[in-house]
Structures are given as structure tokens and as C-alpha cells.
């Protein structure tokens, strides 16, 4: 079941970055895309340029998710909406940032899957694409954000088991550092945000949308479970040993 077998897609977090690039890529391939995000003005511009259908939606609003999405027949879900508030150590993090990060990245993602996935199961066709992160695979010194993406990793793997015997595929995309507005929002400090990209060439949003297209366009017999992408100069898994206090 390659892209040519699909007709519709829903992309959350579609107003910029990875979401916007994915809307453009799917639209170019003839897919009718529902582009969901909070910023109506950005969606209207994207709709004018791509022909997508704008859907104003905050994934923290549970009731709005179901009332808006329940009746849509979606073949491809790109579960992209997310943010990175709460990068401080957990015991220093702003309680509101903890709440917002987990509500958006985990609870919102789960409700979107529930709202759209039930129809996929009924029609016995579809592809769930969850945008995770290398932060969900490796410890990156961020308990809140890392655990939110770790939950997406676990959710994606468990969905594969729950959907066994159906024609519904599940893919998790795990990017490293991507040149989007993510860090500007995460740290709320332009200088710190700029430093996050010093010394290496970051991934682009199009790199991620290309990976999504690769997974979705695979023959039906192929389920690409996880794609991990990182800048060539970004690595993970180093060990640090701190000396014992004297």
C-alpha cells in the first residue's frame, strides 16, 4: 500500500517546520491533506499555496480533537504537533511547562491517534506516522521532554502489536537537531537558541518529510518501524563519569 493507494492525510503541527514541509510533500504527490494547527493565519497561507484543507486545532483540547476529527476518513496520520518546554532539570522545571509538554506531546498525540485510528481500523487501511525524537531513545539531560518522546517511542511499538492482523502500518520518525523554530520556543532566549546550532549543519524540515515519504511510499508488505536521523556531526550515547565528592 504505497502513496498511490492513499487518498487523504492529516498532519498536526502543520503551520511551520516539519509539519509544513510534510503538508507540501504530500500535496505535491496528490494527497488531499488536512493541515491542523493553532495558527489560522499560517494555515490559510499554506492552503492557498498547496490546496490543503486548514483545520484549526489545539491538540491539548481533547473534546475539540474528537468533534473535529472523528468524521474524517484519514489514510495517513502524521502526528507531528509537539513542543519542548521544560528542558531544565525536572526539579527546576516550571510546573506549567511540565504540564504543557506532556499534554501536547503525549496526551494530545494519543487522542489524535484514537480519533483517527478507529476509522482506519474500520476501513482496514492506513499509516500512522509518529514524530518522536532521538530524545526518546537516548538520555539527553532533559527528563520532561525526553520522557514525553520516550512515551511516543513506546506507544509506536505497542501500536504495532495492537494493530497486528490489520493493513495499518506504524512508523516512528526520530530526528536529531532540526533547523526549525523549535528551540526558539523551547528556551525563549534567542542567544541560547542560536548556540544550539553552532559548529555543525543541522537537519532541515525537508530531510524529515523525505523520510516520512520514504516510509509511507514503501510497498504494503514493508512496515518501516523506526527511522532515526541526526546531523552527521551530532552523536549520542557518550558516557560521563563524575568524580565522587570528597
Predicted feature locations:
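C-terminal helical subdomain
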Residues: 172-173, 191-238
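Residue(s) in the substrate-gating loop at a strand-loop-helix junction
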Residues: 133
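Active-site loop-to-helix junction immediately N-terminal to the catalytic Tyr of the SDR YXXXK motif
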Residues: 93, 139-147, 158
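Alpha-helical segment proximal to the catalytic Tyr-Lys
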Residues: 118, 161-164
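Substrate-binding pocket helix/loop in short-chain dehydrogenase/reductase
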Residues: 88-90, 97-99
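Conserved glycine-rich cofactor-binding loop
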Residues: 15-16
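Active-site helix of classical SDR
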Residues: 113, 148
Amino acid at each position: 500500500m504505497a502513496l498511490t493507494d492513499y487518498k487523504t492525510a492529516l498532519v498536526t503541527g502543520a503551520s511551520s517546520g516539519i509539519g509544513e514541509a510534510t503538508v507540501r510533500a504530500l500535496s505535491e504527490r496528490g494527497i488531499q491533506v488536512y493541515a491542523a494547527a493553532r495558527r489560522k493565519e499560517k494555515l490559510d497561507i499554506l492552503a492557498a499555496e498547496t490546496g490543503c484543507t486548514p483545520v484549526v486545532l489545539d491538540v491539548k483540547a481533547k473534546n475539540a480533537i474528537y468533534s473535529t476529527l472523528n468524521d474524517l476518513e484519514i489514510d495517513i496520520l502524521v502526528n507531528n504537533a509537539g513542543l519542548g518546554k521544560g528542558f531544565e532539570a525536572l526539579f527546576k522545571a516550571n510546573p506549567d511547562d511540565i504540564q504543557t509538554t506532556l499534554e501536547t506531546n503525549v496526551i494530545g498525540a494519543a487522542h489524535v491517534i484514537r480519533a483517527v485510528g478507529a476509522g482506519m481500523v474500520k476501513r482496514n487501511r492506513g499509516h500512522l506516522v509518529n514524530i518522536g525524537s532521538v530524545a526518546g531513545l537516548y538520555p539527553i539531560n532533559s527528563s520532561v521532554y525526553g520522557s514525553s518522546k520516550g512515551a511516543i517511542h513506546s506507544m509506536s511499538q505497542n501500536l504495532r502489536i495492537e494493530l497486528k492482523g490489520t493493513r495499518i502500518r506504524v512508523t516512528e520518525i526520530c530526528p536529531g537537531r532540526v533547523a526549525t523554530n523549535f528551540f526558539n520556543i523551547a528556551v525563549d532566549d534567542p542567544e541560547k537558541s542560536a548556540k544550539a546550532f553552532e559548529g555543525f549543519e543541522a537537519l532541515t524540515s525537508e530531510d524529515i518529510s523525505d523520510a516520512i515519504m520514504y516510509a509511507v511510499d514503501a510497498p504494503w508488505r514493508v512496515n518501516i518501524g523506526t527511522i532515526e536521523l541526526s546531523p552527521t556531526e551530532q552523536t549520542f550515547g557518550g558516557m560521563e563519569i563524575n568524580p565522587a565528592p570528597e
